[in-house]
Amino acid sequence: MAGDTGRERKNNRETGSHYERVAGAYLEQEGYEILEYNYRCKTGEIDIIAKEAGYLVFCEVKYRTSDKKGHPAEAVNPAKQRAISKSALCYMTVNGIDEIPCRFDVVSIENHKVILYRNAFDYTG
């Protein structure tokens, strides 16, 4: 963010990583197999990549400490959905995956409450 110091960016990354691990633990309890955290490619980043019930699942993790900025899942707007979709395509291409159905889930964490939205949005290229 503009105006953030290096320390603030580091703290934000650490906080984000913490909540991604919380989300990952929750997903494992729900039967997901975590394949990767923080996948990065030229088109963007995916917080968690997992397998569940025969699907390759691309998960976006959103957290809030209060509702002042709205519900966490609301932050996954159409632009974010496109970026995640492109990154998912990149992951599948790089890894030679084309025969596995995939879906996009959102994990919302607000005040320590975890909510999973399966199939939260469709691929948007």
At which residue positions do the language-model features occur?
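Conserved catalytic cores of phosphodiester-cleaving nucleases, focusing on short active-site segments
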Residues: I46-K68, I84
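Generic recognition of well-ordered alpha-helical segments
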Residues: Q29, K86-S87
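Acidic-basic catalytic patches of nuclease active cores, encompassing PD-(D/E)XK
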Residues: M1-Y37
